[in-house]
Regions:
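Internal nucleotide-binding/catalytic subdomain
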Residues: 78-170, 174-176
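A conserved helix-loop-beta module that forms one wall/lid of the active-site cleft
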Residues: 16-76, 81
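Glycine-rich phosphate/pyrophosphate-binding beta-alpha loops
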Residues: 186-200
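A charged helix-plus-loop insertion that forms the helical arch/lid used to bind
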Residues: 12-16, 190
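Short glycine-rich anion-binding loops that position phosphate/pyrophosphate groups of nucleotides
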Residues: 66-68, 112, 188
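Single conserved hydrophobic/aromatic residue that forms the stacking wall/gate
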Residues: 1-11
Length: 200
């Protein structure tokens, strides 16, 4: 009813709430990124323990609930199939299994899109975690020019393809071989982007 009334009154909702159907569901988010030729870690949808055995080539990996979960909640690090015995996992919801990367560092980037061709892109932020909790962030991130340009290019592409008007944050991984991956999209400044309040 609310959406119908908004259309009748010509009210534009920004950011578009439909975006949440993509970015708050990990499997949908990864598929969206793949369709736009944006590199992610290898992944598969998991609905039961047999699926993990089927995709054992993704181990060692991280098993994550497709929805909800943050700061390590709803996530299980699996070294191998035997490691399943060390966790109490209830397969009453959908998961995704992501292959671990040989991580060198994590960065994030805040972008605000006002309209077509009207952007404000902040410098990449370097993040350090302890036990899957963000400890601190520094800006600018200590990264090479290629990663700097590619992270901004992908963040801009994501906001365009989502037709996003507002502020979002894209989280990236850089592995030891200097490959760049998008880990997740947050439809807000993200905890790593709070420094933009006072740093600019």
């Amino acid at each position: 009813y609310l959406h119908r009334r908004q259309r009748q009154m010509c009210i534009r909702d920004s950011p578009n709430p439909e975006v949440n159907k993509i970015v708050q569901h990990r499997y949908s988010e990864k598929n969206f990124l793949g369709k736009n030729n944006i590199r992610t870690t290898k992944f598969e949808k998991i609905v039961n323990e047999n699926d993990i055995k089927k995709y054992r080539d993704l181990l060692p990996g991280i098993l994550k609930t497709s929805t909800l979960g943050y700061d390590g909640k709803g996530q299980y690090k699996l070294k191998d199939l035997e490691d399943l015995n060390n966790h109490e996992i209830r397969f009453d919801k959908e998961f995704i299994l992501e292959k671990l990367v040989n991580l060198e560092k994590e960065i994030s980037l805040v972008i605000t899109r006002f309209s077509k061709d009207n952007y404000e892109i902040y410098e990449p932020i370097e993040n350090l975690h302890e036990e899957q909790i963000l400890k601190y962030s520094t800006i600018p991130a200590q990264i090479n020019l290629s990663h700097f340009k590619k992270s901004q290019e992908w963040a801009k592409l994501i906001s365009e393809e989502l037709q996003y008007v507002g502020t979002l944050c894209v989280e990236f991984f850089i592995d030891k071989d200097q490959n760049l991956y998008v880990n997740e999209i947050a439809p807000r400044v993200h905890n790593s982007g709070h420094l933009t309040i006072n740093a600019y």
